[in-house]
UniProtKB/Swiss-Prot annotation:
The lineage of its organism: Eukaryota, Fungi, Dikarya, Ascomycota, Saccharomycotina. This is Asparagine--tRNA ligase, cytoplasmic. The keyword Metal-binding does not apply. Its main location: cytoplasm. GO terms for cellular component: cytoplasm; cytosol. PROSITE patterns: AA_TRNA_LIGASE_II. It comes from Saccharomyces cerevisiae (strain ATCC 204508 / S288c) (Baker's yeast). One of its GO terms (molecular function) is asparagine-tRNA ligase activity.
Length: 554
């Protein structure tokens, strides 16, 4: 009978361990297990090192019983490991055979099939039973035994595509990655009842070509814009983030909104003009101007095209523009951008009530046309399921009555005090009031002191102006407008009050000199109205490449 030695402090549990006093095992169970693995017929004597006596002593009966039980467990574990290793080897052999088989599969187009009709995805939905070819980016990719499912995206829509047979087994198919570009050939089939996919159809692929293979592994698309990434990192990767479902949907709704706004303006007989973006005048105050050197002279990026639009009234009638405006505001709120798409209009020979009705018509009809759009309408429902289209007439609420309402509802100003006439209603209080009332509001007749110098005073109360902010529940202000001063003396007094040198504004002042008229206008931030339509937390999600303080890339 052999003897084996165990020393917990310095022993090693390995099959190569000698089990001598110089090279002992760590545990009794492993000593028995190692002995049996070497086919020893008889159980060895076990000697365990006792630290307190500083010598090896024969193992006790109870400890030996425990060691035998532990040895049985090690044997079962060893058998299981061998089985797993065998399965692993078999799997590797199968995979190697599959890979070899996959490498031998050549993807060829069957020339006996009808010629494929080149089509965009959105148009393919109506081509059931026809063989088509569509090109795009792999938006989703999953495998199911011997079938590969691909959701293809081309900007016009999405289509589910099915690859089966040799196409699904080919190595070229197994190497496909998200965002790879491909051209797929196949037959459009209608989905059976109970199944859903974009357009209610799918493409049974019979042949395809790889146009550009996107990287996998660490450089894969999903690693670049991982869900939950820091917003600043996602903004750095904006060019990739735009491929996502939500952002691309917002951009499509944006396009439909601008198209709808132009449609309403056409119906209302407004003419589109394109005023300059480089100017030497200000509209909204000098502190938010982006200054630049213009051939040795000081110039600015436009804050608003209002002044130029006013000059067009005498020649073109009612006019509008849709172009970028710039505000150098070091504001990091979710409602501000340094560059935004500004919808602006000026209208002649109208009253303040006429102006309000015009703004009402523009908003109601534009939203209606977006919701009726076959692409944008479903996207709004997808992004904002609870959206309710606004209906005319909007609630009219004068500034003085809003002050009363805020105080009655114990909503304080920024100093924590009750509101008083002349206070500027800050965003937080305005939002709380709007959300509580719960309907679109025309907030009107603001005090002269808190509005721009060019706004016309009310004839029945010269303390206030014929001005309006349009407030929407859950968003706040989306539009601001007013009647403009049409009297030259009153306008000059406004310039003087603001300390503005009138020399650079001669062309604007001339509008009152050479045939003045009652007129008014407004500006709408496209990104704000989109945030309302699409239920976005920040206007940054509503701009293609948002620009704000600290962000001017990519």
């Amino acid at each position: 009978m052999s003897s084996l030695y165990i020393k917990e402090a310095t022993g090693v549990d390995e099959l190569t361990t000698a089990g001598s006093q110089d090279h002992p095992f760590k545990t009794p169970a492993y000593a028995l297990f190692a002995s049996q693995q070497k086919s020893d017929a008889t159980e060895p004597k076990l000697f365990v090192f006792k630290t307190e006596d500083n010598e090896y002593q024969e193992i006790s009966a109870s400890a030996l019983k425990k060691a035998r039980k532990g040895c049985d467990g090690l044997k079962k574990k060893a058998v299981k490991q061998k089985e797993q290793e065998l399965k692993k080897q078999q799997k590797e052999a199968e995979n190697a055979a599959k890979q070899l088989s996959a490498l031998n599969i050549t993807i060829k187009e069957d020339e006996s099939l009808p010629a494929a009709i080149k089509t965009r995805i959105y148009d393919s939905y109506s081509k059931v039973g026809q063989r088509v070819k569509v090109s795009g980016w792999i938006h989703r990719l999953r495998s199911n035994k011997k079938v590969i499912f691909v959701v293809l995206r081309d900007g016009s829509g999405f289509i589910q595509c099915v690859l089966s047979g040799d196409l699904a087994l080919a190595q070229q198919t197994l190497d496909l990655t998200l965002e790879s570009t491909v051209t797929l050939y196949g037959t459009i089939v209608k989905l059976p009842e109970g199944k859903t996919a974009p357009g209610g159809v799918e493409l049974n692929v019979d042949y395809y070509e790889v146009v550009g293979l996107a990287p996998g592994g660490e450089d894969s698309f999903t690693n670049k814009i991982a869900e939950g990434s820091d917003p600043s990192l996602l903004l750095d990767q904006r060019h990739l983030a735009l491929r996502g479902d939500a952002l691309s949907a917002v951009m499509k709704v944006r396009a439909a909104l601008l198209k709808s706004v132009r449609r309403v303006y056409d119906e209302e007989h407004l003419t589109e003009v394109t005023p300059p973006c480089m100017v030497q005048t200000q509209v909204e105050g000098g502190s938010t101007l982006f200054k630049m050197n213009y051939y040795g002279e000081e110039a600015y990026l436009t804050q608003s095209s209002q002044l130029y639009l006013e000059t067009c009234l005498a020649s073109l009638g009612d006019v509008y523009t849709i172009q970028e405006s710039f505000r150098a505001e070091k504001s990091h709120t979710r409602r501000h951008l340094s560059e935004y798409t500004h919808i602006e209009a000026e209208l002649a020979f109208l009253t303040f009530d006429d102006l309000l009705q015009h703004i009402e018509t523009l908003i109601v009809k534009s939203v209606q046309y977006v919701l009726e759009d076959p692409i944008a309408g479903p996207l709004v429902k997808q992004l904002n399921p609870n959206f309710k289209a606004p209906k005319a007439p909007f609630m009219r609420l004068q500034y003085k009555d809003a002050i009363t309402w805020l105080n009655e509802h114990d909503i304080k100003n920024e100093e924590g005090e009750d509101f008083k006439f002349g206070d500027d209603i800050a965003e937080a209080a305005e939002r709380k009031m709007t959300d509580t009332i719960g309907v679109p509001i025309f907030l009107t007749r603001f005090p002269v002191e808190i509005k721009s110098f060019y706004m016309k005073r009310c004839s029945d109360d010269p303390r206030v102006t014929e001005s309006v902010d349009v407030l929407m529940p859950n968003v706040g202000e989306i539009t601001g407008g007013s009647m403009r001063i049409d009297d030259m003396d009153e306008l000059m007094a406004g310039f003087k009050r603001e300390g503005i040198d009138t020399d650079a504004y001669y062309w604007f002042i001339d509008q009152r000199k050479y045939g003045t008229c009652p007129h008014g206008g407004y500006g709408i931030g496209t990104e704000r109205i989109l945030a309302w339509l699409c239920d976005r937390f920040t206007v940054r999600d509503c701009s293609l490449y948002p620009r704000f303080s600290g962000r001017c890339k990519p």
